[in-house]
């Protein structure tokens, strides 16, 4: 997976990382090419040892509770769409590789499984869910940003041709599962024809938790500076660094 430069996304991202008073919003939109090279090919070969690329993997139902296989069916229909809530292992690899590239080097998603992903029922539902979360958090600032945001995404990925997936991990695996996390979402807009994924990730962190962490980090840095003054330079490299987690 290769991160593709996009100046429109950079402009939008600068407005998705803000402090709202009682919370911090941290969001980003990134575009990735699905063309594999080097390490990706090696990882894909290892991934395929558990199943061939065309094998279908069952996904979890979307958090809406509405399965894509049910859209367009009458309420009395009992049959279940065999493909709607599944994806090929190759597509699953693309989703996992996107997470790895986006969160590198802090997290490794190589062990992620299909049940941690969902296929979303429709573009409209995803757009409304994103808009609702960000309007509640950012108010009028997002109202003015919204058309530019979705125009930039559509221009990059052609939304009408996309399958949309989300990552909804267990708490133990969630990179946003730390204390103080108020909400988060992780959406993948996958255009198979373009061999490209746009990844939209956002979270809201309690202002108290975020400030407390920053204050702790500053204190750690002050302590390290004092240690630098007190200790011989030859021993400085052996000291463990303090981190705010």
From Swiss-Prot:
GO process annotations (BP): negative regulation of transcription by RNA polymerase III
InterPro entries in UniProt: Maf1, Maf1_sf
Biased composition (Acidic residues): 223-232
Recorded GO CC terms: cytoplasm; nucleus
UniProt xrefs under Gene3D superfamilies: Repressor of RNA polymerase III transcription Maf1
Identification of the protein by name: Repressor of RNA polymerase III transcription MAF1 homolog
Family to which the UniProt record says this protein belongs: Belongs to the MAF1 family.
Subcellular localization, as worded in the UniProt entry: Nucleus; Cytoplasm
Keyword terms: Cytoplasm, Nucleus, Repressor, Transcription, Transcription regulation
Protein origin, superkingdom: Eukaryota
PANTHER family recorded: REPRESSOR OF RNA POLYMERASE III TRANSCRIPTION MAF1, REPRESSOR OF RNA POLYMERASE III TRANSCRIPTION MAF1 HOMOLOG
Short name of any one Pfam family annotated for the protein: Maf1
Protein's job: Element of the TORC1 signaling pathway that acts as a mediator of diverse signals and that represses RNA polymerase III transcription. Inhibits the de novo assembly of TFIIIB onto DNA.
Region (Disordered), start-end ranges: 59-84, 223-245
A GO molecular function held by the record: RNA polymerase III core binding
Main location: nucleus
